[in-house]
């Protein structure tokens, strides 16, 4: 049981599962690439220059004395987080999910790599006052490999079930 977010380059995938059964899942066709393109347009730089700078230097904990690049990336990270969490709130309200215990939230994906991402994400979760209680909010131990590892585990479980039926 938990709430998982995968912040990838091309999209954000979200799944709320209760006892291993997906309750709410959705994808948003925005991710790190979208942030890079928007920031590049805002500061008049190439997307590759923005991406390289972001991957090497971005610190989302820094909030003052920002360069134009830092300002643009900071703004578009906040826009993406608000968009994702706002969509989650809408989905939760539609599904009328009721859970007895606070949900653990796990975040993965390359877009979540910058220092300060988790804090910004937690702030977005608080701003939207979701209709469920959240517990620990944390980064996955291997941001870039967690989704692949989960898919492998699911495939192994499926194969095991098939073999048991035979």
What are the language-model segments listed below?
Residues 1-25, 39:
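Gly/Thr-rich phosphate-binding beta-strand-loop-beta motif of the actin/hexokinase/Hsp70
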Residues 123-131:
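Short helix-loop-beta junction
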């Amino acid at each position: 049981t938990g709430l998982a977010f995968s912040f990838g380059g091309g999209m954000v995938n979200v799944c709320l599962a209760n006892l291993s059964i997906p309750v709410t899942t959705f994808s948003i066709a925005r991710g790190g690439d979208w942030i890079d393109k928007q920031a590049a347009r805002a500061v008049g730089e190439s997307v590759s220059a923005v991406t390289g700078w972001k991957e090497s230097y971005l610190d989302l904990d820094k909030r003052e004395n920002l360069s134009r690049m830092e300002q643009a990336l900071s703004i578009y990270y906040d826009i993406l987080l608000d968009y994702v969490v706002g969509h989650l709130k809408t989905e939760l309200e539609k599904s009328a999910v009721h859970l007895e215990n606070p949900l653990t939230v796990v975040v993965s994906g390359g877009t979540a790599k910058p220092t300060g991402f988790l804090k910004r994400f937690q702030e977005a979760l608080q701003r939207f006052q979701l209709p469920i209680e959240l517990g620990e909010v944390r980064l996955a131990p291997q941001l870039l490999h967690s989704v692949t590892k989960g898919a492998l585990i699911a495939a192994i479980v499926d194969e095991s079930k098939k073999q048991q039926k035979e």
